[in-house]
């Protein structure tokens, strides 16, 4: 056709113009269409009419370049525009079906819903199939809306509860505001007092400076006086020497004068001389006259004789001359001797004078040097003190600002924590109300949901959020009933999931791993619990599904996440705590004392209920830092509860000073132990014996012959599954009741008739002389506070008390009296926790010391009250057959040992012994009276443990002993003294002896023996102290040496360490142990007492290592605190006072530690 080409072109242009006109109308309303159209609704119809394909649908719904619904709607219009008129027609039909208003807006016509296109493409069957699918979708949406309506109603009720709780919170906040203003006023008053104290401190500092100046002036004056004294001493010595010389010379002259002959003697000698001369002349004249008359022979003889006489005279003259010369020489020699003696005396005087002068100058030089050294030390000390004062002043200013900031932060944090606590309480109430509401509405929910509801919808609502298909959007409103604060107070799920409602739980309850028996028990008691307040631990004890178990956090936080179904009973801890103390303020609730009010449950309730996890969970993050997981710590706590509650405390027989005389014949009877508690009641204790107080009329016990006043001696039978024999005459009141209550099967009671003892016991109790038949003395190994530990008496570690009743008012408390340290008389009386409760309290204190310093301790403060309630419950632990306990018993015992090792380290011991919560860890021996009860308690589990690990030391590790049994001793003679730290002993002993204490103190004379003798004595007798003097000799001290000093009524000062205390006590010698506390504040004062120069850090480390030995002492010790002395002289005075004070005190000895 020649003209076909132009006509066809015109026709195509006309069609194109018509299409453009049609789409022009759509483009005019493009904004409204793209705003309200949901492409996900239109694409199924468009695809069924074969206008768009799968690729176009995927591009529209899932293209990343089209983030919003408007962009996707615009892209869909563009794609349909490319399809021409067919695209326009199908688009209008889809608008006619889904959006009638928009169809009327575009075309101006009313919708007829003919679906011509789909009828043409698919036929009437395709249209019917399409409409059925749409109906099913609408039904599903309607069911979802119904479910959403139920959830919104539940949410409404929840919001009403929250409104009530917010009202209560507002009241609490107003109370906190008033308390804040009150604390602010108190802070201002304290600030004024602080300013006043600072002024007083400044005045004291000024006074101290003036006194220091006066002291310096007095020291200078003392030095001048000392110099004058030295000069006077020199002059005195010189005058004494001169006086001595003069005295010697005057004595010689006096002797010469006294020995001089008298005048009468001289005259008499002269007369005698004249008479002798006259007689000599007469004889010469006679001789001459005789010569003349004699014959010649005679003359010759006379001449010869004369000659001889002359010669004799000459010889005599020579001898006289010689004698004269000798006398002259002797006189000269005597003169020289006297001269030399005088010179010698002069030289000796000069020598002694020079020696005295030398000594004086030497002493003066030493004095001057000491003074110079002292002046230098004082100068250095003054410079150092000045620098320290300046540094301390600047540090104080910095710390003052820091403390002010910390105070503000702590106040804000305190307010936040209290608000958070109120919110958590509100959350707990909210959860409790939801639990009750869900239990009520379970049937309504079953009826509200359609029976033909597909399982896929439920899984989408309660399981993980599945990815949306076909681009469908999420629902407009959430179906969760959980409050927005739940994520703050409970651990989040990983990954986050919706909270299951009751319908979801019922669908999978048959798959729960929890036993059906517990589930039925919970359902049976559900109606009984509706009117009571459930504890947090009971709120979370619902039986839950396996899928919900997977959502739990990897470590246990609290019992609200527990997988064990424990029905909350009428004895709920929280309810009883609130009922017992309804007027207690919120400040008191933050303390740790609330948990003990629930400990007054009877033994039946102990066996019926098992409460939530222990306080170990309150600081799970700290456990993780120590390498311990919460499950193992839970097993440790469960084991410890079982051990501490298996048997009460049993004092040894030696602690009771009551001696029972022989009584009447012993009788015995056999009864049924299961009903023994209801048939008779007991009275008495370990000091007076256990008596039958009353017997139920018509019971088997009455028929067997038991009557009031019969004394029970022995019980034989099955006690807690073991065949045992318990001596009831030495049992405490608590243990006797415990034994009677836990008998099973046939038991044999041995008794005797003792009406006199029973009447005396009843009379003494009526007169108020005694409270029960118990009487023994214990030493505390931990601090007990009346405000925090649910008792009426506050005691410190190492206090000695007299226990008078182990079941005071039939509760788990001991009535005791504080003991006077000098007279042993009972002072004020009150109650303390029983032995088992004290063991649990000791464990809690050890946990606090172990977790101190953790960053999460503040975050875990809100768990303290709840953790203590759950931990310190006198409950029955799980049986050894519990699969959660038995397989990991060895692991738990190992962790318990690790806990004891942690607190037994030297640095932890120093912190533990010097903290406010001081505890004393002593090693328990199976032979001791305290550990004997623990051994009986742990026997069953120890046997089970030995089957798993034969070399286990479980019994050795479980030695937490809160109370130690002690016995009083008296010593009239003066006791020896031991000092610790030992490095100070030698210096202190020397200073005490040199300071005028020789009348009261002395050192012990040691024996020097050979090596063989020493080895022999070591085997045969006790050696208190020994030291190797040389390779073949030893210096040793035996008890006999110390007793010899005590016999002189003096204190024996020993330089030995305190390790010899046990040997001394075993030898009946009771030493006084003095502990001189060394810390950073007073370490500089010990410089003069150290035997050799040591660094301060090394000396402090050695002292702290020695300090841990004090815990193992079987006796008490005295402590010299740093603030008691400021100088060595004051230290010696304080030591003397302490020794005198300890000498007057009673000696308390823990014989189990020997």
Swiss-Prot record:
Region annotation (Inhibitory domain (ID)) ranges: 450-666
PROSITE patterns the record matches: CARD
Domain CARD: 18-110
Gene Ontology, cellular component aspect: CBM complex; cytoplasm; cytosol; extracellular exosome; immunological synapse; membrane raft; plasma membrane
Source superkingdom: Eukaryota
GO MF term set: CARD domain binding; guanylate kinase activity
The PDZ domain, residue ranges: 667-755
Post-translational modification: Phosphorylation at Ser-559, Ser-644 and Ser-652 by PRKCB and PRKCQ leads to a shift from an inactive to an active form that activates the NF-kappa-B signaling.
Coiled coil region boundaries: 130-449
Domain notes: The linker region, also named autoinhibitory interface, is less inhibitory on its own than that of CARD9. The linker region together with the inhibitory domain (ID) are required to prevent constitutive activation and maintain CARD11 in an autoinhibitory state. Disruption of the inhibitory domain (ID) region triggers polymerization and activation, leading to formation of BCL10-nucleating filaments.
Subunit and partners: Homodimer; disulfide-linked. Homomultimer; polymerizes following activation, forming a nucleating helical template that seeds BCL10-filament formation via a CARD-CARD interaction. Interacts (via CARD domain) with BCL10 (via CARD domain); interaction takes place following CARD11 activation and polymerization, leading to the formation of a filamentous CBM complex assembly. Component of a CBM complex (CARD11-BCL10-MALT1) complex involved in NF-kappa-B activation. Found in a membrane raft complex, at least composed of BCL10, CARD11, DPP4 and IKBKB.
Associated pathology: B-cell expansion with NFKB and T-cell anergy: An autosomal dominant condition characterized by onset in infancy of splenomegaly and polyclonal expansion of B cells, resulting in peripheral lymphocytosis. Affected individuals also show mild immune dysfunction, including some defective antibody responses and T-cell anergy. There may be a predisposition to the development of B-cell malignancy.
Protein name (database record): Caspase recruitment domain-containing protein 11
Organism (species): Homo sapiens (Human)
Gene: CARD11
């Amino acid at each position: 056709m020649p003209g076909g080409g132009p006509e066809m072109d015109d026709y195509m242009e006309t069609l194109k113009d018509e299409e453009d006109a049609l789409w022009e109308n759509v483009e005019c309303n493009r904004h409204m269409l793209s705003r309200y159209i949901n492409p996900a609704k239109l694409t199924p119809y468009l695809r069924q009419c074969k206008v768009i394909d799968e690729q176009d649908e995927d591009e529209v719904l899932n293209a990343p370049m089209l983030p919003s619904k408007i962009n996707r709607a615009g892209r869909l219009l563009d794609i349909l525009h490319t399809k021409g008129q067919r695209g326009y027609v199908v688009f209008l039909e889809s608008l006619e079906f889904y959006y009638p208003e928009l169809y009327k807006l575009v075309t101006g016509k009313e919708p007829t819903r003919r679906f011509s296109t789909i009828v043409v493409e698919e036929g009437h069957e395709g249209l019917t199939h399409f409409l059925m699918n749409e109906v099913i979708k609408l039904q599903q949406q309607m069911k979802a809306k119904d479910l959403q309506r139920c959830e919104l109603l539940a949410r409404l009720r929840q919001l009403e509860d929250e409104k009530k709780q917010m009202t209560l919170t507002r009241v609490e906040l107003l109370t906190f505001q008033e308390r804040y203003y009150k604390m602010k006023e108190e802070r201002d008053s304290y600030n004024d007092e602080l300013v006043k104290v600072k002024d007083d401190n400044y005045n004291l500092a000024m006074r101290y400076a003036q006194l220091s100046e006066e002291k310096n002036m007095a020291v200078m004056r003392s030095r001048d006086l000392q110099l004058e004294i030295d000069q006077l001493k020199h002059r005195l010595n010189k005058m004494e020497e001169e006086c001595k010389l003069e005295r010697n010379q005057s004595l010689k002259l006096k002797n010469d004068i006294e020995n001089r002959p008298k005048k009468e003697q001289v005259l008499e000698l002269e007369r005698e001389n004249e008479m002798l001369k006259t007689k000599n002349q007469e004889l010469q004249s006679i001789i001459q006259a005789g010569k003349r008359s004699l014959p010649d022979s005679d003359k010759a003889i006379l001449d010869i004789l004369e000659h001889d006489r002359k010669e004799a005279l000459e010889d005599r003259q020579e001898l006289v001359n010689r004698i004269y010369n000798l006398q002259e020489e002797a006189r000269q020699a005597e003169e020289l001797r006297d001269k030399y003696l005088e010179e010698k005396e002069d030289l000796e005087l000069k020598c002694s004078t020079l020696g005295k002068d030398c000594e004086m100058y030497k002493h003066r030089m030493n004095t001057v040097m000491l003074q110079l050294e002292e002046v230098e030390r004082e100068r250095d000390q003054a410079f150092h003190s000045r620098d320290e004062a300046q540094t301390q002043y600047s540090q104080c200013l910095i710390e003052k600002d820091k403390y002010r900031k910390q105070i503000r932060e702590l106040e804000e944090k305190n307010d936040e924590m209290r608000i958070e606590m109120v919110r958590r309480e509100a959350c707990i109430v909210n959860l409790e109300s939801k639990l009750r509401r869900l239990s009520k509405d379970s049937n309504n929910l079953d009826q509200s949901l359609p029976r033909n509801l597909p399982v896929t919808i439920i899984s989408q609502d309660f399981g993980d959020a599945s990815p949306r298909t076909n681009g469908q959007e999420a629902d407009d409103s959430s179906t969760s009933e959980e409050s927005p604060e739940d994520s703050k107070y409970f651990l989040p799920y990983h990954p986050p999931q919706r909270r299951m409602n009751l319908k979801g739980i019922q669908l999978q309850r048959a798959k729960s791993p929890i036993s059906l028996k517990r589930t039925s028990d919970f359902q049976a008691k559900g109606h009984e619990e509706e009117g009571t307040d459930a504890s947090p631990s009971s709120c979370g004890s619902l039986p839950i599904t396996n899928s919900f178990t997977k959502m739990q956090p990897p470590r246990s936080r609290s019992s609200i996440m527990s997988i064990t179904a424990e029905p909350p009973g009428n004895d709920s801890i929280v309810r009883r705590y609130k009922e017992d103390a309804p007027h207690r303020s919120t400040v008191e609730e933050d303390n740790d004392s609330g948990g003990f009010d629930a400990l007054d449950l009877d033994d039946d309730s102990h066996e019926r209920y098992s409460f939530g996890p222990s306080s170990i969970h309150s600081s799970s993050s700290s456990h993780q830092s120590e390498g311990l997981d919460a499950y193992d710590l839970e097993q440790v706590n469960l084991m410890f509860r079982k051990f501490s509650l298996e048997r009460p405390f049993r004092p040894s027989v030696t602690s009771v000073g009551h001696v029972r005389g022989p009584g009447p014949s012993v009788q015995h009877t056999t009864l049924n132990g299961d009903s023994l508690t209801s048939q008779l009641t007991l009275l008495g204790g370990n000091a007076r014996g256990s008596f039958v107080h009353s017997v139920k009329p018509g019971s088997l016990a009455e028929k067997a012959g038991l009557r009031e006043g019969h004394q029970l001696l022995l019980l034989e039978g099955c006690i807690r599954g073991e065949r045992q024999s318990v001596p009831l005459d030495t049992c405490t009141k608590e243990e006797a009741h415990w034994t009677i209550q836990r008998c099973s099967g046939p038991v044999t009671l041995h008794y005797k008739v003792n009406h006199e003892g029973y009447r005396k016991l009843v009379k003494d109790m009526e007169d108020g002389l005694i409270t029960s038949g118990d009487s023994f003395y214990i030493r505390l190994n931990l601090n007990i506070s009346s405000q925090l530990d649910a008792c009426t008496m506050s005691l410190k570690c190492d206090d000695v008390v007299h226990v008078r009743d182990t079941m005071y008012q039939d509760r788990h408390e001991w009535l005791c009296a504080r003991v006077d340290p000098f007279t042993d008389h009972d002072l004020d009386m009150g109650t303390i926790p029983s032995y088992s409760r004290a063991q649990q309290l000791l464990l809690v204190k050890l946990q606090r010391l172990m977790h101190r310093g953790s960053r999460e301790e503040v975050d875990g403060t809100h768990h303290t009250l709840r953790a203590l309630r759950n931990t310190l419950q006198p409950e029955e632990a799980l049986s050894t057959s519990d699969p959660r306990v038995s397989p990991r018993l060895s692991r738990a015992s190992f962790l318990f040992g690790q806990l004891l090792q942690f607190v037994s380290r030297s640095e932890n011991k120093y912190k533990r012994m010097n903290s406010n919560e001081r505890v004393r860890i002593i090693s328990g021996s199976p032979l001791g009276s305290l550990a004997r009860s623990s051994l009986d308690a742990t026997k069953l589990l120890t046997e089970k443990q030995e089957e798993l690990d034969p070399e286990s030391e479980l019994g050795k590790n479980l030695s937490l002993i809160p109370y130690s049994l002690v016995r009083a001793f008296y010593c009239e003679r003066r006791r020896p003294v031991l000092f610790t730290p030992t490095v100070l002993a030698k210096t202190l002993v020397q200073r005490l002896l040199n300071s005028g204490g020789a009348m009261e103190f002395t050192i012990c004379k040691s024996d020097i023996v050979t090596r063989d003798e020493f080895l022999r004595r070591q085997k045969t007798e006790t050696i208190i102290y020994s030291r190797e003097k040389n390779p073949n000799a030893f210096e040793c001290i035996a008890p006999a040496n110390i007793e010899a000093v005590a016999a002189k009524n003096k204190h024996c000062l020993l330089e030995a360490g305190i390790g010899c205390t046990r040997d001394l006590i075993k030898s009946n010698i009771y030493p006084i142990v003095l502990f001189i506390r060394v810390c950073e504040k007073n370490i500089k004062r010990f410089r003069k007492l150290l035997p050799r120069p040591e660094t301060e850090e090394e000396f402090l480390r050695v002292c702290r290592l020695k300090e841990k030995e004090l815990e193992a002492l079987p006796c008490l010790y005295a402590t010299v605190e740093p603030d008691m002395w400021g100088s060595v002289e004051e230290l010696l005075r304080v030591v003397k006072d302490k020794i005198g004070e300890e000498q007057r005190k009673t000696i308390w000895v823990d014989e189990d530690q020997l």
